[in-house]
Protein backbone atom coordinates (compact mmCIF):
# COMPACT_ATOMS: atom_id res chain seq x y z
CA UNK A 1 0.00 0.00 0.00
CA UNK A 2 1.47 3.34 -1.03
CA UNK A 3 -1.44 5.80 -1.12
CA UNK A 4 -2.70 8.08 1.65
CA UNK A 5 -6.24 6.71 1.83
CA UNK A 6 -7.37 4.82 4.92
CA UNK A 7 -8.46 1.23 4.47
CA UNK A 8 -12.22 0.61 4.20
CA UNK A 9 -14.01 -1.06 7.08
CA UNK A 10 -13.79 -4.48 5.41
CA UNK A 11 -10.06 -4.04 4.85
CA UNK A 12 -7.95 -4.34 1.71
CA UNK A 13 -6.73 -7.50 0.00
CA UNK A 14 -3.42 -8.14 -1.74
CA UNK A 15 -2.70 -11.15 -3.92
CA UNK A 16 0.58 -13.03 -3.43
CA UNK A 17 0.34 -14.52 -6.96
CA UNK A 18 0.49 -18.11 -5.68
CA UNK A 19 3.91 -17.63 -4.11
CA UNK A 20 5.02 -19.89 -1.31
CA UNK A 21 5.90 -18.15 1.92
CA UNK A 22 6.92 -19.26 5.38
CA UNK A 23 7.12 -15.80 6.94
CA UNK A 24 5.12 -12.65 6.17
CA UNK A 25 6.58 -9.38 7.39
CA UNK A 26 4.78 -6.06 7.26
CA UNK A 27 6.93 -2.94 7.39
CA UNK A 28 5.57 0.51 8.14
CA UNK A 29 8.28 2.58 6.49
CA UNK A 30 6.85 6.07 6.11
CA UNK A 31 3.93 8.10 7.37
CA UNK A 32 4.11 11.83 6.64
CA UNK A 33 0.58 12.79 7.65
CA UNK A 34 1.12 12.47 11.39
CA UNK A 35 2.96 10.45 13.99
CA UNK A 36 0.06 7.96 14.06
CA UNK A 37 0.44 4.93 11.87
CA UNK A 38 -1.78 2.05 12.86
CA UNK A 39 -2.28 -1.55 11.82
CA UNK A 40 -5.28 -3.15 13.48
CA UNK A 41 -5.35 -6.63 11.99
CA UNK A 42 -3.63 -8.75 9.37
CA UNK A 43 -5.03 -12.00 8.01
CA UNK A 44 -3.00 -14.31 5.80
CA UNK A 45 -5.12 -16.80 3.83
CA UNK A 46 -3.98 -19.72 1.73
CA UNK A 47 -3.48 -23.45 1.56
CA UNK A 48 -0.54 -25.53 2.81
CA UNK A 49 2.01 -26.01 0.04
CA UNK A 50 3.47 -29.21 1.42
CA UNK A 51 7.00 -27.93 0.90
CA UNK A 52 9.12 -28.88 3.92
CA UNK A 53 10.69 -26.05 5.86
CA UNK A 54 14.40 -25.93 5.24
CA UNK A 55 16.43 -26.23 8.41
CA UNK A 56 18.71 -23.29 9.07
CA UNK A 57 22.29 -24.41 9.75
CA UNK A 58 23.79 -23.25 13.00
CA UNK A 59 25.97 -20.16 12.94
CA UNK A 60 29.54 -21.18 13.69
CA UNK A 61 31.59 -18.43 15.34
CA UNK A 62 34.86 -19.51 16.90
CA UNK A 63 35.33 -18.63 20.57
CA UNK A 64 37.97 -16.00 21.16
CA UNK A 65 40.05 -18.32 23.32
CA UNK A 66 40.35 -20.70 20.37
CA UNK A 67 41.08 -18.02 17.79
CA UNK A 68 44.36 -16.77 16.38
CA UNK A 69 43.76 -13.46 18.17
CA UNK A 70 44.19 -14.98 21.64
CA UNK A 71 47.89 -14.15 21.95
CA UNK A 72 50.12 -12.20 24.32
CA UNK A 73 51.06 -8.79 22.96
CA UNK A 74 54.76 -8.04 23.46
CA UNK A 75 56.52 -4.67 23.61
CA UNK A 76 57.89 -5.31 20.14
CA UNK A 77 54.35 -5.99 18.87
CA UNK A 78 53.30 -2.62 20.26
CA UNK A 79 56.20 -0.82 18.60
CA UNK A 80 55.45 -2.60 15.32
CA UNK A 81 51.87 -1.32 15.49
CA UNK A 82 53.12 2.26 15.79
CA UNK A 83 55.45 1.69 12.86
CA UNK A 84 52.41 0.39 10.98
CA UNK A 85 50.77 3.79 11.44
CA UNK A 86 53.81 5.41 9.85
CA UNK A 87 53.69 3.03 6.90
CA UNK A 88 49.96 3.46 6.33
CA UNK A 89 49.72 7.20 6.79
CA UNK A 90 52.97 8.74 5.51
CA UNK A 91 54.89 5.90 3.84
CA UNK A 92 57.12 2.95 4.68
CA UNK A 93 60.29 4.89 3.82
CA UNK A 94 59.82 7.07 6.90
CA UNK A 95 59.88 4.22 9.41
CA UNK A 96 63.67 4.55 9.48
CA UNK A 97 63.37 8.14 10.70
CA UNK A 98 62.21 6.96 14.12
CA UNK A 99 63.17 4.72 17.03
CA UNK A 100 60.76 3.84 19.82
CA UNK A 101 61.15 2.88 23.45
CA UNK A 102 58.58 1.70 26.01
CA UNK A 103 59.18 2.70 29.64
CA UNK A 104 56.85 3.43 32.56
CA UNK A 105 56.80 6.88 34.12
CA UNK A 106 57.82 7.26 37.75
CA UNK A 107 54.69 9.28 38.52
CA UNK A 108 52.40 6.77 36.78
CA UNK A 109 51.10 9.22 34.19
CA UNK A 110 50.83 8.57 30.47
CA UNK A 111 53.64 10.47 28.77
CA UNK A 112 55.97 10.71 25.80
CA UNK A 113 59.43 12.15 25.28
CA UNK A 114 60.79 13.33 21.93
CA UNK A 115 64.54 13.56 21.44
CA UNK A 116 67.20 12.91 18.84
CA UNK A 117 69.53 9.91 18.97
CA UNK A 118 72.01 8.68 16.36
CA UNK A 119 70.50 10.93 13.72
CA UNK A 120 66.95 9.66 14.28
CA UNK A 121 63.93 10.88 16.20
CA UNK A 122 63.62 8.87 19.40
CA UNK A 123 60.13 8.59 20.89
CA UNK A 124 59.78 7.22 24.40
CA UNK A 125 56.48 6.52 26.13
CA UNK A 126 54.70 4.21 28.52
CA UNK A 127 52.36 2.49 26.02
CA UNK A 128 51.46 2.30 22.36
CA UNK A 129 48.99 5.19 22.43
CA UNK A 130 51.60 7.41 24.10
CA UNK A 131 54.15 6.52 21.41
CA UNK A 132 51.61 7.24 18.66
CA UNK A 133 50.68 10.56 20.25
CA UNK A 134 54.35 11.52 20.41
CA UNK A 135 54.71 10.58 16.76
CA UNK A 136 51.78 12.83 15.87
CA UNK A 137 53.28 15.72 17.85
CA UNK A 138 56.49 15.48 15.85
CA UNK A 139 54.66 15.19 12.52
CA UNK A 140 52.40 18.14 13.30
CA UNK A 141 54.77 20.60 14.91
CA UNK A 142 58.09 19.71 13.29
CA UNK A 143 57.04 18.47 9.82
CA UNK A 144 53.80 20.45 9.24
CA UNK A 145 51.98 17.20 8.53
CA UNK A 146 48.30 16.86 9.40
CA UNK A 147 46.50 13.52 9.68
CA UNK A 148 42.73 13.78 10.14
CA UNK A 149 39.55 11.75 9.87
CA UNK A 150 38.64 13.18 6.47
CA UNK A 151 41.93 13.85 4.70
CA UNK A 152 45.67 14.04 5.25
CA UNK A 153 48.39 16.55 4.37
CA UNK A 154 51.46 14.35 4.31
CA UNK A 155 54.07 16.26 2.33
CA UNK A 156 57.07 15.27 4.42
CA UNK A 157 60.29 17.33 4.54
CA UNK A 158 63.23 16.05 2.54
CA UNK A 159 65.22 15.19 5.65
CA UNK A 160 64.71 14.65 9.37
CA UNK A 161 63.84 17.84 11.22
CA UNK A 162 66.01 17.82 14.36
CA UNK A 163 64.63 18.00 17.89
CA UNK A 164 66.68 20.16 20.24
CA UNK A 165 66.90 18.67 23.72
CA UNK A 166 63.88 16.69 24.94
CA UNK A 167 60.21 17.51 24.43
CA UNK A 168 58.25 16.03 27.35
CA UNK A 169 54.46 15.80 27.43
CA UNK A 170 52.27 14.05 30.00
CA UNK A 171 48.63 13.86 30.99
CA UNK A 172 46.99 13.38 34.38
CA UNK A 173 43.86 12.00 32.72
CA UNK A 174 44.01 8.18 32.69
CA UNK A 175 40.97 7.82 30.40
CA UNK A 176 40.56 9.63 27.06
CA UNK A 177 37.27 8.38 25.70
CA UNK A 178 35.67 8.47 22.26
CA UNK A 179 32.17 7.92 20.83
CA UNK A 180 28.69 7.06 21.98
CA UNK A 181 26.20 4.56 20.56
CA UNK A 182 24.68 7.08 18.16
CA UNK A 183 28.07 7.84 16.61
CA UNK A 184 28.43 4.20 15.64
CA UNK A 185 25.10 4.07 13.83
CA UNK A 186 25.27 7.51 12.21
CA UNK A 187 28.75 7.21 10.73
CA UNK A 188 30.05 3.67 11.05
CA UNK A 189 27.17 1.24 10.57
CA UNK A 190 28.70 -0.40 7.51
CA UNK A 191 32.38 0.31 8.02
CA UNK A 192 34.86 -2.37 7.01
CA UNK A 193 38.45 -3.07 7.95
CA UNK A 194 39.98 -0.15 6.02
CA UNK A 195 37.68 2.50 7.47
CA UNK A 196 38.20 1.22 11.00
CA UNK A 197 41.96 0.98 10.55
CA UNK A 198 42.16 4.62 9.46
CA UNK A 199 39.99 5.71 12.36
CA UNK A 200 41.93 3.72 14.95
CA UNK A 201 45.16 5.20 13.60
CA UNK A 202 43.75 8.69 14.04
CA UNK A 203 42.47 7.95 17.55
CA UNK A 204 45.85 6.64 18.69
CA UNK A 205 47.67 9.58 17.13
CA UNK A 206 45.47 11.91 19.16
CA UNK A 207 45.82 10.15 22.49
CA UNK A 208 42.47 8.37 22.72
CA UNK A 209 42.86 5.19 24.78
CA UNK A 210 39.27 4.06 25.41
CA UNK A 211 36.99 3.52 22.41
CA UNK A 212 33.36 2.43 22.41
CA UNK A 213 33.51 -0.21 19.69
CA UNK A 214 30.29 -2.21 19.60
CA UNK A 215 31.25 -4.09 16.44
CA UNK A 216 29.82 -7.64 16.67
CA UNK A 217 27.78 -6.94 19.79
CA UNK A 218 25.01 -8.59 17.80
CA UNK A 219 26.97 -11.85 18.14
CA UNK A 220 26.92 -11.40 21.92
CA UNK A 221 23.16 -10.97 21.74
CA UNK A 222 22.84 -14.01 19.47
CA UNK A 223 24.68 -16.22 21.93
CA UNK A 224 22.85 -14.82 24.95
CA UNK A 225 19.36 -15.27 23.48
CA UNK A 226 20.25 -18.73 22.18
CA UNK A 227 21.29 -19.79 25.68
CA UNK A 228 17.92 -18.54 26.95
CA UNK A 229 16.23 -21.00 24.59
CA UNK A 230 15.14 -18.83 21.68
CA UNK A 231 15.28 -20.35 18.21
CA UNK A 232 17.74 -19.06 15.66
CA UNK A 233 14.98 -17.32 13.70
CA UNK A 234 13.51 -15.76 16.83
CA UNK A 235 16.94 -14.40 17.71
CA UNK A 236 17.41 -12.91 14.25
CA UNK A 237 13.95 -11.35 14.35
CA UNK A 238 14.80 -9.66 17.66
CA UNK A 239 18.17 -8.22 16.62
CA UNK A 240 17.83 -4.95 14.71
CA UNK A 241 19.49 -4.11 11.41
CA UNK A 242 22.97 -2.51 11.33
CA UNK A 243 21.78 1.07 10.84
CA UNK A 244 19.65 0.87 13.99
CA UNK A 245 22.00 -0.79 16.49
CA UNK A 246 22.41 2.39 18.53
CA UNK A 247 18.73 2.50 19.36
CA UNK A 248 18.53 -1.26 19.89
CA UNK A 249 21.47 -1.22 22.30
CA UNK A 250 19.84 1.67 24.18
CA UNK A 251 16.66 -0.47 24.45
CA UNK A 252 14.52 1.76 22.24
CA UNK A 253 13.57 -0.84 19.63
CA UNK A 254 14.13 -4.39 18.45
CA UNK A 255 14.01 -6.10 15.10
CA UNK A 256 13.74 -2.95 13.01
CA UNK A 257 15.83 -3.08 9.84
CA UNK A 258 16.57 -6.78 10.29
CA UNK A 259 17.10 -9.61 10.11
CA UNK A 260 20.72 -9.78 9.01
CA UNK A 261 22.19 -12.64 7.00
CA UNK A 262 23.82 -15.43 9.01
CA UNK A 263 27.24 -14.57 7.61
CA UNK A 264 26.93 -11.12 9.20
CA UNK A 265 27.62 -12.62 12.64
CA UNK A 266 30.84 -14.34 11.58
CA UNK A 267 32.09 -11.44 9.47
CA UNK A 268 31.47 -8.80 12.13
CA UNK A 269 33.07 -10.92 14.83
CA UNK A 270 36.17 -11.28 12.66
CA UNK A 271 36.22 -7.50 12.13
CA UNK A 272 35.86 -6.84 15.86
CA UNK A 273 38.82 -9.07 16.61
CA UNK A 274 40.94 -7.37 13.98
CA UNK A 275 40.07 -4.03 15.56
CA UNK A 276 41.21 -5.02 19.03
Regions picked out by a protein language model, each given a short descriptive name:
Residues 2-3, 55, 113, 125-126, ...:
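Short amphipathic beta-strand/extended segments with alternating polar/hydrophobic composition
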Residues 77, 81, 85, 91-93, ...:
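Feature activates predominantly on carbohydrate-active enzymes
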Residues 98, 110-115:
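Extracellular/luminal ectodomains and secreted, surface-exposed scaffolds of diverse proteins
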Residues 10-12, 108-110, 119:
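Residue-level marker for the onset of beta-strands and adjacent loop->beta junctions
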Residues 22, 96-98:
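Short beta-strand/loop motifs in extracellular/secreted proteins, especially
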Residues 59-71, 116-118, 179-184:
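Acidic/histidine-rich, surface-exposed loop or edge segments in extracytoplasmic proteins
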Residues 1-4, 8-56:
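Aromatic, loop-rich ligand-recognition surfaces of beta-strand-rich domains
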Residues 6-7, 73-77, 81:
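C-terminal beta-sandwich/jelly-roll accessory domains of carbohydrate-active enzymes
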Amino acid sequence: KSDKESCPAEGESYEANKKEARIVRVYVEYQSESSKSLINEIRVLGTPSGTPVQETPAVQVEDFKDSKYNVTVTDQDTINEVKGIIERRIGAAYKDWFTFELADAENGYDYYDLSQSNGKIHIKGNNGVSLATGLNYYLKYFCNVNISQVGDQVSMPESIVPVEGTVHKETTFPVRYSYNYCTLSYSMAFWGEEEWRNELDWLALNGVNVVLDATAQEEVWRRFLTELGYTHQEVKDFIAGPAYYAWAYMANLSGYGGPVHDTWFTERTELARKNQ
